Amino acid sequence: MEGVDCSMALADAAAGSPRDLSLVPERLQRREQERQIEVERRKQKRQDQEVEEEKSGFFAAAFARERAAVEELLRGEASAERLEEAANRLQGLRKLLNDSVLFLAAYDLRQGQAALAQLQAVLTERRQELQPKKRFAFKARKKDAAGTAQVDAAPVTSAAPSPPVTKEEEGAPGASWACGFSNLESQDLEKRAEELHQRDVLLSDLTNCTVKLCGNPNTLRLAKARGCKVLCGPVTTSVFLEDCRDCVLAVACQQLRVHTTKDTRVFLQVTSRAIVEDCSGIQFAPYTWSYPGIDKDFQDSGLDRSKNNWDQVDDFNWLARNVASPNWSILPEEERDIQWD
């Protein structure tokens, strides 16, 4: 009621002479100004929310339409032409999602990324179905010294455990990771193009390791790394960092998300805006790593080499628009001279 009385008093004074307005206590004038500012702020907030809802509605309709088209292509009889069209439309879906990151709610973003991962998995499966199967043939039996027949021994499996199956991470492709390294210390590790092409890579629980990934993976996840240097060729979709410390990462990708990571330098080429959350001491610089065959890997990845938003970063823990986030910064030029080899 006091705010209403204040407004009525100011209105009465304004209807009279300037002298009447000067008689209104300064405290009431200031309170009325604050009330008007708050009213304007709420009005602007409602307008912004309406715009965001309109954008989200457009995204949801466009995404659902294109997703249905890709699913229809993948359900039909498999052919190289249909799968190529499905791959192209799936790439368009990825671009739509990446271009909408700024206004999408976190839940909607995760749902979109999960849908993309599922479609990519089905596309990969259908492509494998088109590949010619190897013919089965019996091996000749060997005879021992006594002349008795012996059946070939069963193939020996590797004693090294396969990479662990992880629960589905935000935006990460679902069930399992195709290749990677885990639980190693002070090692120089490398995978080549034929091992990486369009596969999902997991690097986890590494300490003081140097990892070179010379090829075109589909996704890359780096988790629980300490003091590592990770150099990666162009990644077709997303790169995820989680719980890393004192690392150096060089990567080109469509989207980068960094969680719970500290004191890490990222040499980046990215076509969307990078995202950091619950991080500190993250430094960004342009992607400068190179290796023989990188041009072909960029071509296979579908990334636009002329587009690089390496210094466009959104911090989900820093909402002040006009104040720079203290959790990330640009790596000074004099500190970018890295000896990759």
Curated annotation (Swiss-Prot):
Residues 34-49 have a biased composition (Basic and acidic residues). The modification Phosphoserine is found at residue 79. Residues 163-318 form the C-CAP/cofactor C-like domain. The modification N-acetylmethionine is found at residue 1. GO terms for molecular function: GTPase activity; tubulin binding. It is found in: Cytoplasm. One of its GO terms (cellular component) is cytoplasm. Pfam families: TBCC, TBCC_N. Its main location: cytoplasm. Residues 34-55, 148-173 are annotated as: Disordered. The keyword Chaperone applies. Keywords: Acetylation, Chaperone, Cytoplasm, Phosphoprotein. GO terms for biological process: post-chaperonin tubulin folding pathway. Belongs to the TBCC family. Tubulin-folding protein; involved in the final step of the tubulin folding pathway. Supercomplex made of cofactors A to E. Cofactors A and D function by capturing and stabilizing tubulin in a quasi-native conformation. Cofactor E binds to the cofactor D-tubulin complex; interaction with cofactor C then causes the release of tubulin polypeptides that are committed to the native state. This is Tubulin-specific chaperone C. The gene is Tbcc.
